[in-house]
Amino acid sequence: MGSEQDQRKRWGGCLGVFSCFKSQKGGKRIVPASRIPEGGNVSASQPNGAHQAGVLNNQAAGGINLSLLAPPSSPASFTNSALPSTTQSPNCYLSLAANSPGGPSSSMYATGPYAHETQLVSPPVFSTFTTEPSTAPFTPPPELARLTAPSSPDVPYARFLTSSMDLKNSGKGHYNDLQATYSLYPGSPASALRSPISRASGDGLLSPQNGKCSRSDSGNTFGYDTNGVSTPLQESNFFCPETFAKFYLDHDPSVPQNGGRLSVSKDSDVYPTNGYGNGNQNRQNRSPKQDMEELEAYRASFGFSADEIITTSQYVEITDVMDGSFNTSAYSPSDGQKLLRREANLLSQTSPKSEADLDSQVVDFQSPKSSNSYKDHKQRNRIHADEEALLSRVGSVKGSRSYHISSSDAEVEYRRGRSLRESRENRHRKA
């Protein structure tokens, strides 16, 4: 026995160096004040004590206030109050012995405003004392909802974008419905814009019909009475002679005169194909004179003068104004030769031109000079006659303008280069 006690003492001395092997003899530990009741030692310190159904003993003989062992976290820690477990419990009395040996569990309580006040974790109670008044604005009446954007059933885009087949078969009916439903605001910048297919309430334009525009009804599309008021008729098409030219030039002086040049493709612009694909039929049924008139109407709707139009089989880009040769793509349509009419020089308009000078301004795009030069010469004479009639007709329309003709920088540069080239050719001829 003695040897065993000595052996234990030796092991205890060796292991006593480490604090974890030292005997714990009622040492006092610093714990948070919210965990320690302010009444001193209570019966809850007993590990397996019996449950108590009354108020816990709040006094301990000779005990000191344990809340002073730790620095107070708030001034309220100095005051003695009732046990936290009994003040905030649902039944007003709760024994600490019913909890774990270490005291009440921390997950059951939430720390209150002060360190010694704990509150039970419970769903929030909404009352007039705990909830703040709402800061939301007054709910608008349902009458004001009509002033905002329309709801989804009222938007025609779902019907407008149903399928591509519907758009092809119905022509431009959906566009007219969309234009009528969503009209432009009066003050918006885009409300002043007009196009040949627009159908606004005050511009007097009609939607294009699928029918072919004939020569007889083309001039009567907009009937002008003695008072000068335009009366739109039912028959109209995208391009009709003297229709949009008279409307834009006589009744809309606000259209700016930019004086630029427009290169128009006869295959795509002059012959619009509708949804039924009868563009080739319309192309075959039209005479050259009617083509030039429709081209002039198309040109006049965009504010170009008669000598500022270039008609090509394709869109031609002029890179050098001093170069007399023009290049185009290898593609050419099969319905005859396409001629490029070079515009007349403003400096030499007063001097009369001979037939040779007019013929020298026509460039053949199709093929080099061949044996059918007589036919080409006949065709050129006919085109020049049509152009002269066209210029005489448009001159009366242009006489009603109250503003002068302006030219862009590119136009001035092109005319300067052309005049230099023609003067050089004249010097070579004289030499």
Curated annotation (Swiss-Prot):
Signal peptide: none annotated. InterPro entries: At1g76660-like (IPR040420). Residues 412-425 have a biased composition (Basic and acidic residues). Residues 42-55 have a biased composition (Polar residues). Residues 31-55, 257-291, 365-431 are annotated as: Disordered. Coiled coil: none annotated. This is Uncharacterized protein At1g76660. It comes from Arabidopsis thaliana (Mouse-ear cress).
